[in-house]
From Swiss-Prot:
Motif (DEAH box): 642-645
Protein name, UniProt field: DNA excision repair protein ERCC-6
GO molecular function term, any single one: ATP-dependent activity, acting on DNA
Region (Winged-helix domain (WHD)): 1417-1481
Domain Helicase ATP-binding: 515-691
Organism (species): Mus musculus
Transmembrane segments: none
Predominant subcellular localization, coarse grouping: nucleus
Domain Helicase C-terminal stretches: 839-998
Phylogenetic classification of the source organism: Eukaryota, Metazoa, Chordata, Craniata, Vertebrata
Modified residues (N6-methylated lysine): K170, K298, K444, K1047
Locations listed in the record: Nucleus; Chromosome
Keywords for the protein's UniProt record, in alphabetical order: ATP-binding, Chromosome, DNA damage, DNA repair, DNA-binding, Helicase, Hydrolase, Isopeptide bond, Methylation, Neurogenesis, Nucleotide-binding, Nucleus, Phosphoprotein, Transcription, Transcription regulation, Ubl conjugation
Region (Essential for its interaction with RNA polymerase II, transcription-coupled nucleotide excision repair activity, association with chromatin after UV irradiation and for mediating the UV-induced translocation of ERRC8 to the nuclear matrix): 1434-1481
Regions of compositional bias (Acidic residues) in chain numbering: 378-390, 420-435
Length: 1481
């Protein structure tokens, strides 16, 4: 044992600075090496803050230090100069002790610690450098291989680029890719040199194995080149990212986390740990005894007061109910007066403001934040901030008690704040008991106190440490150490094992991606779909940083582990973040910078304290703006924006405030990173990675404008292709920094139930229709259209009328004010005067009977009030939350609804209840009115369909047909398509609808025969839930020449009618806007067509002139998806002929009549419609005669409202026009059959009741089921057809004529045209860079297997192998190689250099076939020999022959093949004839 003595008597307070515990620590304490960094032992001795988490005890420091690792650092006292014996104090001389000067001793100890740290750091750095060097070598090899492959492509394309403009564009793109690879190679080389310098050059110069570079290596990632030449690999790459198996940087997630045993603890610390555990156990027992005594006393008091409370409870409840009813009635009168004032306000000229701003309807702020539809405004953010600030004062008195110690709460619970109960906030039926017993009663359950109070934080941390020690002792006794093995990543990053193993696999991948961003000193957008646990991924990553104790390079190494972190989020979810942090990683000190926080002193001091202790500060977007100077004064390690799309306006004050943090570590969490336009995406990316997308003007000019313009219906082919290329480049640029997984991709991991989302088009009531039409015809709208008035007020008025006419007109008897004794129907806001409320009434009645629970969202608080009155009148239990609900009250309401299953409805405004709120207690969602911003409605939907939901979720979006709401829905779809084009699929088809100002102020009244404008736009997408139409039935019967019983049509008409849709080109679509709606409303035009019918419906093209095309004919692609619309562009095409319209309308008349007249149960119709219609379409001559018929409906009455109702399941349904159903209905699991039947029952009841349901649309089928853009598909089909024809022409030239008597090569036998063995090709002038196949080397079985397995048996395109190595292993016609070469014109043009050269080498070098060769040969042979007239065939003959042979994917190619193979003309009788061209006869 040694001693240190300090002779300096002038500092007596420092005499005992080294107690025995610390002296032992000097001597024996291990200095742990973790990940290349050695902790400073001196800090543990001189500070009370433990490096292992934010513990505050020195004992915890020692405990943490002993866990660091087995490496020990012994302090060598002999290296520290001691005080000479002659210089020692007299009383110490002769005692034989060593005396040290304190300053010298501390300096010596620190020098030894620093030296040890430096040595350990060097060792770790070398180890990391060696590991990183191996990775660099792999990257270098991969990059070099890619460059060689690209050079081969350039060599193949260069000779043809001068003569072929298409190939020239591809060559330019490949050269750009080569430039990118060269830049990447430079960076890799520089990194290699840096690592070589670190390693000292010893054994580092590893020569690249050139032979290995010739092996088959894949590209390191998808790119623009991959988008064009490597579709198969790109799809696989994106699928791995979407399903959470790989990060965007290409790092795959390990299949199974390696179990690593925990390091054995040192014996020196075991006794100390036991002491801590004993003390903790004693303390726990003492507190338990005290708590038991307090509980007993409290129970006596409660039992005495419970009797009196029970006796008065009934009287109190009845009193509150009557008071609430009076308040509701008073508020209704107030809304009536505001409605009258609003009517005058609508007509104000532009530039003038209302005289009384205080009477501005409150719903406007909630409703029209995105009215412009294209770009957000400062008003939206400012409005939310004002809302937060306004309610903050209401909640300050009520909240402060919650976050104080428990003993102070009892006093505060008795206080009922007067500010919360005003004219704008009404407690629901479930809140009234709480209001009488004390407003704070419910908050104790859900609210989680933050760590603003440091004493509370220390107490909570001690509890957590005690529990950890107890749990660890249990594991040690059971010898179960492997369960907590940490998850280790590159460069020493570790996540605690108990935390990491609780994450889903895709969440683990998200943590890995966040670490990759951290290493690159870059930010990112975690854009997982709402409800996939973005919060948990962030907490796990931050916990890993704190746990790993890694120095951050980008912060000058000033932060060890995790530095101060700030999280900005909506006020509704601030305390939800606190709860999640305390649950998943309690060591963090998490404080809320807001009025609802527990910190009672100055906010500036709280910020300073959190920065000092490296804690987590949670605040709102309004506080970021208000306290910008105080917050940005400090250096923050991480800045995280929850619901980061709040900064989508690049010029807003809150956006500029968020972008002033001095840190590269910026993370955005957003389930909808792009909502309206590309300008918003730029704003988000400029926050996480400033400069990545350049400046905003350049980005808008080079990317936003081309991509947006290419998405409109009237875009030219050049604009469409330009938009595609720009979208590819933009997607490749942002992909590494945007991680987005969808629920549909990770559904199996989450075990999420199914979601059924439908759009119910509701008919206006007579009163609504009258008010709507009167307003459209008014002078106010006239002034808007002339530019004299602002459009904003007019749109607000239209939306109010759609919700409820009383919101605009003030209701009946508004002149004299509503009397007290008025009739129920004449009350303000009565539900029978609104078409959508009639539907809501029926839905709620059915769901209440079924025991479902409902979320009811509305944009407007005024509408929410009317719905509240409606719920109270029908005696439904409910809760309500809107902008006036205090921040402190929101989380308790959410918790109460999730836990109390007796509450039926939760009323919410979309903006308040749509962000970060978890309402999985509900399984039915009604979105009462749409928002211009599609993500707003999506956020509301995701409140129920998220992790934790166990039941199937049904979502109904309510829209009024033919009104402004339908236009809003169209705008939502356009924005969603634009988002998909950038984030998902650059080939996303265009949205075939563009509104102008005049269209917004129109009203259409679609009936059963017309359908809605939406049904016309999205015809063929498989979204329509069809219902028969009596008007259409009569018309088609007349066209077909049949009686009303829908007897068998003439056999000759059936294929001819189909041929009209299939081959004959209508002159235009503008005149068929309505007829297409009716013509495609039969079962075959939806998602129930057979493959043959669907393929044939778009397969052929009968042209009236040589220059015409079939673009607009592609109403439906081969898989039933919408490729182009015949209803949109009314100006670009000539009018339609009457005969064509009739034929289109009657194409499937037989099947439609069959559907009308056959009574089938609804479940059978939904499940088995596909097979039924398939058989009926092909054999309608026999089956339609035997089907039981129902009588025709009666003649239409004078009242058009009632005469146009359609029939469903044989029953007339009021207000029904048609119904759509989800096209993948038949593929759902059998386990969801009960839920589906429940939804079907609801729809059936809606159609049977006298409700305002007009039609039903599947929203998911429109958003997710869209096919690629028609122009891109047609261009691809044309290229494939041209290549196939060239291959056929070359093959024909190789065959001998009939006079030779030589059999033609069949693949097995024959001589004529058979390729000879591969000749020695040395000395030839042509470039022989492609493999040659000897067909005789492949048997038929082998060829069939290769066709099925595709690329499994074929070499990769970028294989790098020599040509001779693949002589006998050439790919089949169905392989990816053949498709890529055919698509990029890398084979055939060089074989057409000259006829002589081609004839000389035709036998030796056969053309590389495609998968359409057999189809082309069959078509040619049929038309040449098997039709009624050799050499030509009618459309009907072609249909009958190939209808059953065509697959869905072959439809477009088949049409192009036919048009290139034959010439088309019509006979005098109108029959279409296809005649072989001379070169193919």
């Amino acid at each position: 044992m040694f001693h240190e003595e300090v002779p300096n008597s002038t500092h007596p307070q420092e005499q005992d600075c080294l107690p025995s515990q610390h002296a032992n620590a000097y001597k024996d304490m291990p200095v742990g090496q973790e990940n290349g960094g050695v902790s400073e032992a001196g800090e543990c001795l001189s500070s009370t803050s433990c490096e292992y988490g934010p513990s505050t005890s020195a004992e915890a420091c020692v405990l943490a230090a002993t866990r660091r690792g087995p490496t020990l650092l012994h302090i060598d006292r002999h290296q520290i100069p001691a005080v000479e014996p002659s210089a020692q104090a007299l009383e110490l001389q002769g005692l034989g002790v060593d005396v040290y000067d304190q300053a010298v001793l501390e300096q010596g100890v620190l020098q030894q610690v620093d030296s040890a740290m430096h040595e350990a750091s060097c060792v770790a750095q070398l180890a990391d450098a060696e590991k990183e060097y191996q990775s660099v070598l792999d990257d270098l090899m991969s990059c070099t291989t890619s460059l060689r492959q690209i050079n081969k492509i350039i060599e193949q394309l260069s000779p043809q680029a001068a003569s072929n403009r298409d190939i020239n564009r591809k060559l330019d793109s490949v050269k750009r890719q080569k430039y990118n690879k060269e830049q990447q190679l430079k960076k890799i080389t520089a990194k290699q040199k840096r690592l070589q310098a670190i390693l000292g050059g010893a054994g580092v110069q590893v020569e690249l194995d050139h032979a290995s570079l010739e092996e088959d290596d894949a590209e390191p990632g998808p790119s623009c080149l991959g988008s064009m030449l490597m579709p198969a690999q790109e799809t696989a790459w994106e699928e791995l990212i979407r399903t959470g198996q790989m990060t965007p940087f290409g790092t795959p997630a390990p299949q199974k986390q390696e179990k690593k045993p925990r390091k054995i603890m040192l014996n020196e610390a075991s006794g100390f740990e036991k002491y801590l555990a004993e003390q903790a156990q004693l303390s726990f027992e003492r507190k338990k005894q005290a708590a038991t005594k307090r509980t007993a006393k409290k129970a006596i008091v409660i039992s005495e007061s419970s009797r009196a409370a029970i006796e008065t409870k009934a009287d109190q409840r009845s009193q509150v109910l009557s008071q609430t009813d009076k308040r509701l009635k008073k508020h209704s009168r107030k809304l009536q007066r505001r409605a009258l004032q609003f009517q005058g306000k609508v007509g104000l000229p532009s530039g003038k403001k209302p005289l009384e701003p205080e009477v501005r309807p409150e719903a406007e702020g909630d409703t029209e934040g995105e009215e412009s539809g294209s770009s957000p405004t400062d008003g939206e953010e400012e409005e939310e901030q004002e809302e937060e600030e306004g309610v903050a004062s209401l909640s300050s008195d009520d909240v402060s008690y919650e976050l104080k110690p428990l003993r102070k709460r009892q006093k505060y619970q008795k206080k009922v704040p007067v500010q919360e109960i005003d004219d704008d906030f009404f407690p629901s039926s479930e809140e009234e008991d709480e209001a009488m017993e004390g407003r704070g009663g419910g908050r104790k359950v859900a609210r989680r106190q933050d760590d603003g109070d440091e004493d509370y934080y220390k107490q909570r941390l001690r509890r957590w440490n005690r529990l950890r020690l107890q749990d660890k002792e249990k594991r040690l006794k059971l010898e179960d150490d492997s369960e907590e093995s940490d998850a280790e990543f590159d460069e020493g990053f570790k996540v605690p094992g108990f935390l990491f193993k609780k994450l889903f696999k895709y969440q683990q991948t998200g943590v890995r991606w966040l670490w990759e961003l951290h290493c690159q000193q870059a930010g990112g957008i975690l854009g997982d779909e709402m409800g996939l646990g973005k919060t948990i991924q962030i907490i796990a990553f931050l916990a890993g940083l704190s746990y790993s104790k890694i120095r951050t390079r980008g912060s000058n190494y000033r932060f060890e582990g995790l530095g101060p972190t700030i999280i900005v989020c909506p006020t509704t979810v601030m305390h939800q973040w606190v709860k999640e942090f305390h649950t998943w990683w309690p060591p963090f000190r998490v404080a809320v910078l807001h009025e609802t926080g527990s910190y009672t002193h100055k906010k500036e001091r709280l910020i300073r304290d959190i920065v000092y202790c490296h804690g987590v500060l949670i605040t709102s977007y309004s506080y970021i703006r208000l306290m910008q100077d105080d917050i940005s004064r400090h250096d923050w390690h991480y800045v995280i924006l929850d619901e980061g799309h709040k900064i989508r306006n690049p010029n807003a004050a809150v956006t500029l405030a968020c972008k002033q943090f001095r840190t590269p570590h910026r993370i955005i969490l957003s389930g909808s990173p792009m909502q309206n336009n590309l300008r918003e995406l730029w704003s988000l990316f400029d926050f996480i990675f400033p400069g990545k997308l350049g400046t905003l003007p350049v980005f808008m000019e080079q990317f936003s404008v081309p991509i947006t313009m290419g998405g409109y219906s009237n875009a030219s082919p050049v604009q469409v292709k330009t938009a595609y290329k720009c979208a590819c480049v933009l997607r490749d640029t942002i992909n590494p920094y945007l991680l987005r997984r969808m629920k549909s991709d990770v559904k199996m991991s989450l075990s999420l139930p199914d979601k059924n989302e439908q759009v119910l088009f509701c008919r206006l009531t007579d009163e609504q229709h009258k008010v709507y039409q009167n307003f459209i015809d008014s002078k106010a709208v006239y002034r808007i259209l002339n530019g004299e008035n602002q459009i904003f007020s007019g749109l607000v008025a239209l939306r109010k009328i759609c919700n409820h006419p009383d919101l605009f007109s003030g209701g009946p008897k508004n002149a004299s004010g509503p009397p007290e004794d008025e009739l129920e129907e004449e009350q303000f806001g009565h539900w029978r005067r609104s078409g959508k409320m009639i539907v809501v009434e029926s839905l709620l009645k059915i769901w209440h009977r079924q025991g479902q629970r409902v979320l009811l969202f509305s944009q407007s608080r005024q509408m929410l009030h009317i719905l509240e009155v409606f719920l109270r009148a029908h005696k439904y239990s409910y809760l309500k939350m809107d902008g006036t609900t205090t921040i402190a009250s929101r989380q308790p309401l959410i918790t109460k609804y999730n836990e109390d299953t007796s509450i039926f409805v939760f009323l919410l405004t979309t903006r308040v209840g749509g962000l970060g709120v978890n309402l999985t207690g509900a399984n039915r969602v009604i979105i009462y009115d749409p928002d211009w911003n599609p993500s707003t409605d999506t956020q509301a939907r995701e409140r129920a369909w998220r992790i934790g939901q166990k039941k199937q979720v049904t979502v109904y979006r309510l829209l009024t047909a033919g009104t402004i709401e339908e236009k809003i829905y169209h705008r939502q779809i356009f924005k969603q398509f634009l988002t998909n084009r950038v984030l998902k699929d650059p080939k996303q088809r265009r949205f075939f609808k563009s509104n102008d100002l005049y269209e917004l102020f129109t009203l259409t009244s679609p009936d059963a025969s017309q359908g809605t404008e939406t049904s016309a736009i999205f015809a063929g997408t498989g979204s329509s839930i069809q219902t028969p139409k009596c008007q259409l039935k009569k018309r088609t019967s007349t066209v077909l020449g049949t009686d009303p019983k829908c007897k068998k049509p003439p056999v000759s008409d059936t294929p001819a009618n189909a041929a009209t849709l299939i081959g004959e080109k209508p002159k235009a679509a503008g005149a068929t806007g309505r007829s297409v709606t009716s013509g495609e409303s039969g079962p075959f035009k939806g998602d129930h067509d057979t493959n043959g019918n669907r393929a044939s419906s778009v397969a052929f093209g009968e042209e009236t002139d040589a220059g015409s095309t079939l673009e607009h004919l592609s109403v439906m692609s081969g898989d039933g998806k919408h490729s182009d619309s015949p209803t949109v562009d009314h100006t670009s095409r000539p009018p339609v002929e009457a005969s064509t319209s009739e034929k289109q309308g009657s194409s499937y008349a037989g099947a439609r009549c069959q559907a009308q007249t056959e009574p089938v149960p609804m479940s059978e119709q939904m499940e088995g419609q596909f097979s039924k219609y398939k058989s009926k379409r092909k054999h309608d001559a026999s089956e339609e005669e035997t089907t039981e018929k129902r009588p025709q409906p009666k003649q239409k009455a004078k009242n058009s409202k009632h005469c146009r109702d359609a029939k469903f399941e044989g029953t007339r349904v009021p207000h029904l026009v048609k119904k759509r159903r989800y096209r993948q209905q038949t593929s759902e699991q059998e386990g969801g059959a009960k839920d589906r039947s429940s939804d079907d029952y609801v729809l059936e009841k809606l159609f049977k009741k006298s409700v305002g349901v007009h039609s039903v649309v599947r929203h998911d089928a429109i958003i997710d089921g869209s096919s690629p853009d028609y122009v891109l598909v047609e261009a691809e089909a044309n290229r494939v057809a041209q290549d196939a024809l060239k291959a056929l022409r070359l093959s024909r030239q190789q065959c001998l004529g009939a006079a030779s008597g030589v059999p033609t090569w069949t693949g097995h036998r024959g001589i004529s045209g058979a390729p000879t063995g591969v000749k020695n090709r040395f000395g030839q002038k042509r470039d022989s860079s492609l493999p040659v196949q000897h067909p005789s080397s492949l048997t038929e079985k082998t060829q069939n297997n290769m066709k099925k397995e595709g690329k499994a048996h074929t070499p990769e395109h970028f294989s790098g192998k020599e040509d001779g190595a693949s002589v006998s292993g050439a790919p089949s016609s169905s392989s990816l190689l053949a498709r890529m070469r055919a698509r990029n014109h890398m084979i055939l043009p060089e074989r057409l250099e000259s006829d002589s050269e081609h004839l000389a080498e035709a036998a030796a070098v056969p053309p590389c076939g495609t998968e359409h060769d057999d189809l082309l040969v069959d078509m040619r042979n049929f038309i040449a020999f098997q039709a009624q007239v050799d050499g030509q065939a009618s459309t009907q003959e072609i249909l009958q022959e190939f209808e059953s042979k065509l697959s869905v994917a072959q439809s477009c190619v088949f049409r192009e093949l036919l048009r290139n193979l034959c010439n088309f003309h019509r006979t005098p009788g109108g029959e279409g004839i296809w005649k072989l061209k001379p070169e193919y006869c």
